[in-house]
Amino acid sequence: MRYGYFDDKNREYVITQPDTPLPWINYLGSEAYFGLISNTAGGYSFYRDARLRRITRYRYNNVPLDFGGRYLYLRDNATGAFWSPSWQPTRTPLDSYTCRHGMGYTIIESANQQISAKTLYFVPLGANLEIWSTTITNQRDTVADLSLFSLIEFCLWDAWDDATNYQRNFNIAQVEIEDGVIYHKTEYRERRDHFAYFACSAPLAGYDTHREDFLGPYRGWDKPVVVERGESANSEARSWAPIGSHHVKLTLQPGESRRIIFLLGYQENPRDQKFDPPDSQIINKRLVKPIIAKYLQPETVDAAFADLRAYWDGILGIYQVDTPDMATNRMVNVWNAYQCMVTFNMSRSASYFESGVGRGLGFRDSSQDLLGFVHQVPARARERILDLAATQLANGGAYHQFQPLTKRGNDAVGSGFNDDPLWLPLAVVAYIKETGDFDILNAPVPYENKPGTETPLAEHLERAINYTLNNLGPHGLPLIGRADWNDCLNLNIFSDEPGESFQVAPLKKDGKVAESVFIAVLFVLAAKEMAALSDKVNQRISESANQVLPFAIRHSHFYLDAAAKMEQTIWAHGWDGAWFLRAYDAFGEKVGSHECAEGQIFIEPQGVAIMAGLGLDDGRAELALASVKERLATEHGIVLQQPAYSRYYLHLGEISSYPPGFKENASIFCHTNPWIMIGEAIVGHGDQAFDYYKRICPAAREGISEIHRCEPYVYAQTIAGRDNPRHGEAKNSWLTGTAAWNYVAITQWILGIRPSYDGLQIAPVIPMDWQGFTATRIFRGVTYHITVERQGGGNTVSLVVDGKPVEGNIVPLPA
């Protein structure tokens, strides 16, 4: 069943009925001001940090679902009937409805009682505000006497405190109203230098800022007393719950339209200029008033929206393909690339499954997100790399998470997730291959953001490698610490306290026994990439006469020797006969072995081992892939492990706390599926790689939306596995490493167009029934027009560049 369709020309997904299985959302903003918006105008906004700078309030797990957002109410003043153009919150049946989610914008259009409403929501580039551009049209043959009410609910800034500390928060809310603009200034009188504002372009018949006066006692958003009676209370919030609502009266002739613009924004003042007059408690509005005046002008709004569309045309134009498969084209050309931008901005902080109050930006998560984003805005990728490295510990370890507003490590979670450091070298290598910016290696970066501790980024990478080498267990494999990539495989926690967080629970074991085969294969991959980087750096130095070594980087022999030694250890202690083991627990017993009663085979080490080159020369790579296909593959994707854990195992931790088939306990954890796709491509299995790609491809699953339930235009983190009655149902959409890794799998390994130090590599491994494809790739400022034609049954490439044969499969960089 479909709830909409892809509008490929406009790069939009068009939702045609409001009651989708779950809220189908979009993101507004791409720089500092962000918003989440659902197909019925639910969601919230924040500045930089979804916890510490939450602008509007949102209640997760609410009943009814997705109540609270950017709401408009239309009222027919002649009859008293009112409705929501976005369907929610009144849920009045509409005569027509569409929601168009586009690149950084959403358009909701509907009609009821021959009155149509169309609202465009977006965040202008370079502005810390969002625009609601609303057009109301009278389609009747008589005059329409209407009232339009806007509504947002302000959050008291810290979203966690806002949702928990009522004894204080019911007493602190403050607003100002001036020239029809509602200013939210809670705590501005003391510690804060920022405020929010809500403005309207039309003359007002009234306003409200106090929730209870707007709604009425014991009423909800679906039936506000102010809208019901058609008159605002002109309330001013003094404590309790502050809101923003404008009342605009409209008299429309037959066929007449009226455009009203609403602005919701964030503003900071210099601390010594907070008040005007200085000795008052009145917000200094000298800086914000010109901004409000500018963006309330229709011509400014139209120009800003055109700029946003052009911005995304440029971003998406960096990589465009035309393949025989429509779902692939949609994901590569538009939706997967778009999701990579969103995950770069959000990491795992704010979605409809992540409340924005806990995780901030993850070290591992953000390092992987860079892999699918680095070609889009390299300058921002560079900045993120340096921010990540600055949270690294002096011993090479890393904070698991850091807050985007402060860029400091999260002490509550801390470090000890022992795979974290190894993702940084992979991110840096991807960045340098894309940009050729070797100078980043010489950038001075502190540890734990402590001034005076700076070393070149190259040394941070070396310390990341050494962190693994300095933390090996009894078999010579890396110690797992608190966890590795699978945060729920907690081999040292032994938690038996109800409600205790596995991520912050104290270690019950000393951590000197439990080892991770996954970290071992990841280490081999990272060490080999560091060796190749070292060789390239030394080559550049040797080719530049009299050049002083600009940064310190170990010789490639160091990394190759470390990788070779780890490979020997893996074959001795990490191979189970037909697949790679997952780990050794705190008692030295195998995890992910045929000897185990449950959890005999895990997906994670299989694909990454092949990416690291293990087993390619002796058939064991193909044997591991065959085991994955036989034991883990389902019609909806590849499950994380089998058999699922049927009960809680104290020594395994959170992974066994989930019911079978959900999350880390044998769901289709989509993040890991592209590792297998890449592995299949590396061994030359184009059909199998693409088959796995299509199984979890959102656009290919659009026809089973009643089963999949999440958005058909973006990846979800997890799909219920075959051990669960809800097999095929997705959860945790949008913010997942699945986005970056699937983008890498399809664009760089199946289509085979990937950056290298020396040029653009063309090495497709496509399905046998494809006769070829075309692509456009902008790489280091040069536009490459690529035509791939199948001339046989293999994957060997004969490269022709500008009409001339070129040896190998790398298009050399222009002279």
Model-derived features: positions:
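Anionic coordination/interaction segments
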Residues: 1-364, 379, 384-387, 391, ...
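Short, basic, low-complexity termini and linkers enriched in Ser/Thr/Gly/Pro
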Residues: 274-290, 534-561
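Catalytic cores of carbohydrate-active enzymes
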Residues: 149-151, 399-401, 522-537, 550-652, ...
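Aromatic-rich carbohydrate-recognition surfaces in CAZymes
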Residues: 361, 365-366, 370-381, 385-479, ...
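Solvent-exposed loop and edge beta-strand segments that line ligand/cofactor-binding
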Residues: 351-366, 409-419, 504-520, 589-612, ...
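Inter-helical turn/loop segments and adjacent helix faces that build the functional surface
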Residues: 137-144, 270-273, 434-449, 527-538, ...
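Short strand-turn-strand beta-turns centered on an Asx-Gly dipeptide
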Residues: 800-807
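Active-site acid/base region of carbohydrate-active enzymes
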Residues: 320-334, 383, 388-397, 423, ...
